[in-house]
Amino acid sequence: GALYFGYIYYNSHFVNPWQSSSDKAGSASVVDNYSEDVQTAAAAFNLPYEYLMALIQLECSGIRPAGERFEPHVFRRLQAVRDGKRKNYENITPSHLANASDEALRNLATSWGPFQLMGYKCILLDVQIRDIRGDRGVYHGVNWINITYGDRLRRGEYKNCFHMHNTGRTYPRVGLPTTHDPQYVPRGLAGITRYKLNS
């Protein structure tokens, strides 16, 4: 029991060596593909360049164009909102989804762009999905970050911000992180140091 808990604790608080090596190798892609756009957006919203670069590495590994990821559980929740079986999902209400087809909901339940924003986040930004996955994806992603947790980010709450980006909630005061990958937050924090040195 204690050995297992120790492993889980270590894995969620420290970057393991093989992940660290992979992140260092992949950082060149992030710089080559996104550095200029991130510098512009970071300045426009007064957000830390190094955090945004580390987040891009976590979310899309610096690949441009970034991939997409469909989330079936989000799709089911959005269907329930549209069909009147659920009052809301985050800031999405039935009025936002009136007459939306299943294909439209599928796009809203897919993450897009360098920050892998869920399609339904476009509603808050008042943009189209093609905007967050297109040439201005960095700008729209940073705008969403600014609206959602920008004040925390400007205060340097990096641990909370990485956790919020992935889960929608701050880092737990007690217990383990609830990110999809237990290495998500420690890898992000290590990335901040790496990109600060390269800025």
Annotate the PLM regions.
Residues 1-16, 27-33, 37, 43-45, ...:
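Non-catalytic cell-wall polysaccharide-engagement segments
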Residues 16-17, 55:
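A composition-driven signal for long, intrinsically disordered, charge-rich low-complexity tracts
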Residues 18-24:
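Active-site flanking loop/helix segments enriched in acidic
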Residues 64-65, 72-88:
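Charged mid-protein connector segments
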Residues 65-70, 175-177:
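Short, solvent-exposed loop/turn and secondary-structure capping segments
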Residues 70-76, 179-184:
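Juxtamembrane/interface motifs at transmembrane-helix termini
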